[in-house]
C-alpha cells in the first residue's frame, strides 16, 4: 500500500496526515507542544467500499511506527460510541478510559 505523508506546523504544535495514495483512507495525528510524548489521533476514515480489507489496521500501524520513531509513547483518541468502531480500536490495543459527550476516550502506550 502506497502512503502519502503530509506534515503541518501550527503555533500550538503539528499535525501529520497519512493518506492512502488512491485517496480511499486517511489518518490524522496531532502533536501538541504542551504534551510532549503524546499523540492525539484526531481522525481515521476509510471509504465504505474499501472497508474490511485491513487498510485501517495498516494506517494505525504506520501511525504507531511514526510515533515510536519520534519519541512518542502514548496515543490518545476519542471513539464514537459505535460497537464496531470501538471493537476495532480495542483489537488494535486501545484501552477505554471513560465515556464523555457521546465519545469513548481511549489510549494506548506504545
State where each predicted segment sits.
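Conserved GNAT acetyl-CoA-binding A-motif
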Residues: 60, 67-80
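Conserved beta-strand-loop-alpha-helix junction that forms the acyl-donor binding cleft
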Residues: 76-86, 102-103
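Acetyl-CoA-dependent GNAT
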Residues: 1-38, 42, 99
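A general lysine-centric signal
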Residues: 108-109
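Conserved acetyl-CoA-binding loop-helix of GNAT-fold acetyltransferases
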Residues: 46, 52-65, 91
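Conserved acetyl-CoA-binding loop of GNAT-fold acetyltransferases
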Residues: 90-99
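Conserved acetyl-CoA binding element of GNAT-fold acetyltransferases
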Residues: 37-48, 104
Amino acid at each position: 500500500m502506497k502512503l502519502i505523508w503530509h506534515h503541518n506546523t501550527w503555533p500550538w504544535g503539528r499535525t501529520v496526515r497519512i493518506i492512502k495514495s488512491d485517496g480511499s483512507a486517511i489518518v490524522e495525528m496531532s502533536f501538541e507542544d504542551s504534551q510532549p510524548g503524546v499523540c492525539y489521533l484526531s481522525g481515521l476514515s476509510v471509504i465504505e467500499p474499501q472497508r474490511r480489507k485491513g487498510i485501517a489496521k495498516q494506517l494505525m500501524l504506520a501511525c504507531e511506527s511514526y510515533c515510536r520513531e519520534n519519541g512518542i509513547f502514548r496515543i490518545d483518541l476519542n471513539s464514537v460510541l459505535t460497537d464496531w468502531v470501538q471493537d476495532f480500536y480495542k483489537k488494535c490495543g486501545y484501552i477505554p478510559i471513560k465515556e464523555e459527550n457521546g465519545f469513548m476516550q481511549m489510549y494506548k502506550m506504545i
